[in-house]
Amino acid sequence: MIRDLVIVGSGPAGYTAAIYASRAQLNPVQYEGSVTAGGALMTTTEVENFPGFVDGVMGPVLMEDMRKQAARFGTELITDDVVEMDLKGDIKTIKDGSGNVVQARAVILAMGSAYKKIGLVNEDRLSGRGVSWCATCDGFFFRDQTIAVVGGGDSAVEEATFLTKFASKVVLIHRRD
């Protein structure tokens, strides 16, 4: 059976696409991944900049609610990884880690992004506890502190500039000499 739509990814963009597609009666299939559905917000303690949550909401709670909403409208949720895609032609082919193949007329890729880690000791352990990858999301928590931004491109300079609104001092560290 050829499906109307396959969505790859289970962060806010993936679930939002699933909710809208289901309500439009496109009967979407959504691949959530085999490890943890919900994307990067699953490791975020409190989300304070999501509309509608005046007092904030825990990242995992928000993502579970989005997942339930997508399912309620009829999205077929598959907890597996996509290992192969052929997106050429009118019919797209998606193969998952279990060897199942789904064909669809359209595919939405909503896999999010991965932050580039710098390899510091305890970097993973301190994520969300002083180590951050999002100035807009977390700058507020570092008011009147010295903040270091690691990077040398436009994004690093942009983040450092934004953080001057909160920090007592911003240090920009470039990776290369």
What role is predicted for each listed range?
Residues 1-3, 96-106:
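Core beta-strand elements of the Rossmann-like FAD/NAD(P) dinucleotide-binding domain
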Residues 16, 38, 117-118, 158:
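Glycine/Thr-rich phosphate-binding loops of Rossmann-like dinucleotide-binding domains
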Residues 2, 7-33, 127, 133-177:
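Rossmann-like dinucleotide/flavin-binding elements
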Residues 42-101:
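N-terminal Rossmann-like dinucleotide/flavin-binding domain of flavoprotein oxidoreductases
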Residues 98, 107, 111-134:
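Glycine-rich beta-alpha-beta "Rossmann" dinucleotide-binding loop(s) and their flanking helix/strand
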Residues 30-43:
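N-terminal glycine-rich anion-binding loops that anchor highly charged ligand groups
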